[in-house]
Amino acid sequence: LLSRTPKGTELNGEATTYVDDFEGAQSNIDLRDVLSWSLSSVPAANVQGSDAPIDDLSSGHHRARLAWYTIDPVFYSSQRPSEISNNDLSEDEVRRVFINEIFPQQDLVQGQTAVQYTMDLAYYPEEKGPYNTNPYGSFVNEPSENWAGITRALSSTNFDQSNVEYIEFWLLDTFSENDELTDESLGNLIFNLGSISEDVLRDGRKQYENGLPGT
């Protein structure tokens, strides 16, 4: 035996080294379940209204409309409504995304779906969001100053102990073919991690913004 070459590692009479790809060694927290997300409170920084007093509803005067959802697979089947055409479903905003589009080197096992499950976001900066008491005229005059947000709880709160090191996501740019857009007209995507307030109205009161109490 050669030095530092264990017995039983030969292939075709030569010492062979196997490199493990550590498949399954990573743990992940899937955040795509739309039912786990709800309307966010006013961020502590970076948006209009962050510096408003706690008992001042003007903190939400720049909240715009945001929708989060998944597209029902029925729209891609023979049961889809007749008024929806193939051209409609080919638009980037609504088309299906396939796994090999994001992970071209990934092999699919037999029976595995080739469709990538996605969470879709639709932001309307010129439309008022929920709990926005700002007069409509002054709201639409400043769409570049508006914002929207959603929030959810995480099952793992100790990122160090769980060895959570980064956020991994894939974003489909639906504006790449719009020549009228400039860098100044595009928005920002911000992630806030930590202890997040659930006081949507930011009035310091338990108003059940997420619905009426059960009793």
What do the predicted segments below correspond to?
Residues L1-T215:
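Surface-exposed, low-hydrophobicity segments enriched in Gly/Pro/acidic/Ser residues
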